[in-house]
Amino acid sequence: MFVSAHSVFPSADCFGYRGGVSDISNIVILTGAGISAESGLATFRGPDGLWEGHRVEDVCTPQALARDPVTVHRFYDARRAALVEVRANPAHEALARLDAAWTGELLIVTQNVDDLHERAGATRMLHMHGELLSGLCAACGERFRWDGPMLAAPEGPFAAPACSTCGAAAIRPDIVFFGEIPYQMDRIEQAIARADLFVSIGTSGAVYPAAGFVRTARHHGAATLELNLNPSEGSIFFGATRLGRASELVPAWVDEVLG
């Protein structure tokens, strides 16, 4: 379903305004949990406010890691293992197709910590909230590819993995916890400032700083478009909104963009 959300762009096309491909050169796309939900990955917060049965405060804060590292590591080990059971869906594949075909600037900024964009073939992208398949040394800042569990002995005394660079037993999930600064914010803000089109896909519009990107984009003159299952908390700020399943909306939108 297409919803012309506001009178700012009353006859919005696939670019979120009255215009066409000749007016668009630089695109920034923000993706959230909604794009991966159809692959079988739980959204960050379900209707009950929990993430896979846990309060976010118990598994996604620096305080939780310090207080109960076993629970935190067990949680992310389970999320990492779950990635093996899922695959990229048509929405990821469509964005990878756009990534490959678009001759202007394009940046996919994902709030997701899975690797489904990469598996689909996207290359012009970044993870602002970190990655499940990465480990971070809290002592020296080195990052490592990490495919398996970090919790070597789930039932015994906790011991963090040792860093091969500095030797400290300080490896933690490379996840941006609440209270920490998202990654590559300078690059994201610069890309949004140059964007002609900002598109948000499958996001709640509730988590900052990402929830503020649409207003930044509009401030710099970009057209704005939301693709979501339901209107987000920030829908009012978009020039146009399309509602439906990401696996249907995103391929259709990419087809329109690429002609």
Residue positions per predicted region:
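Conserved catalytic core of sirtuin-type NAD+-dependent deacylases
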Residues: 2, 13-259
